[in-house]
A protein has these predicted regions:
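N-terminal Rossmann-like FAD-binding beta1-loop-alpha1 element of flavoenzymes
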Residues: 1-25
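Active-site substrate-recognition segment that forms the wall
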Residues: 12-19, 45, 74-78, 165-172
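Short glycine/proline-enriched coil/turn segments at helix->beta-strand junctions
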Residues: 18-23, 73, 118-119, 142-151, ...
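Glycine-rich FAD pyrophosphate-binding loop
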Residues: 19-40
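Rossmann-like dinucleotide-binding core of oxidoreductases
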Residues: 30-33, 44, 52-55, 69, ...
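Dinucleotide-binding Rossmann-like beta1-alpha1 core, especially the glycine-rich loop
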Residues: 42-120
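Predominantly flavin-linked oxidoreductase catalytic cores and closely associated redox partners
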Residues: 126-172
Length: 172
């Protein structure tokens, strides 16, 4: 038996994936799922365009993006994003950034900015997820509650979470 703490996007997806092979309980302190950071943030699925100095993070972002947009495709829609390189104070120039995009196989176009602050950048496609539809979907398929004597507890809460004390289960 697995207890997932936190009904944000991470907690809901993890509970959904695990419930195909395990008994899973999702505990969220709010009445509705996807209300905290999952609701207040941009709800944009990142491919890794904004991590030019971390290939490992880009690979993880791409993998997560592909998983999410495949499994939850009916809740996702594409969005065009421009990543512009500042004329002054940037830690990367446009040529290095474009090389990074090619090396990481991130789809993009090159764009000339009309801003005085940035001359060049990349046109990129990412995705947004529909929080209202996902909330309804997860609300129907996930078992909410507190597990009695769980074998595992997965803490997917955000900054206001107290630490879990180890008792008769493993903390992952």
């Amino acid at each position: 038996m697995i207890q997932v703490r936190g009904g944000g996007i991470y907690g809901c997806v993890i509970a959904h994936v695990l419930q195909s092979n395990h008994e899973v309980y999702l505990h969220e302190k709010e009445e509705e799922l996807l209300r905290g950071a999952s609701f207040n943030n941009f709800r944009r699925l990142h491919r890794g365009y904004h991590y030019p100095f971390s290939p490992r993070t880009v690979k993880a972002s791409k993998k997560s993006f592909n998983f999410f947009t495949e499994v939850y495709k009916k809740f996702c829609s594409p969005i065009q994003i421009q990543y512009l390189i500042a004329n002054e104070g940037s830690k990367i120039d446009i040529d290095s950034y474009l090389r990074f995009l090619r090396e990481m196989r991130l789809p993009h176009g090159v764009t000339k900015s009309n801003s005085d602050l940035a001359e060049w950048g990349a046109d990129c496609t990412e995705a947004l997820y529909d929080i209202t539809k996902l909330r309804k979907f997860f609300g129907k398929i996930l078992t909410r509650g507190i597990a009695k004597k769980p074998d595992f507890v997965i803490d997917c809460t955000y900054a206001d979470s107290p630490l879990i004390k180890k008792k008769n289960f493993r903390v992952l």
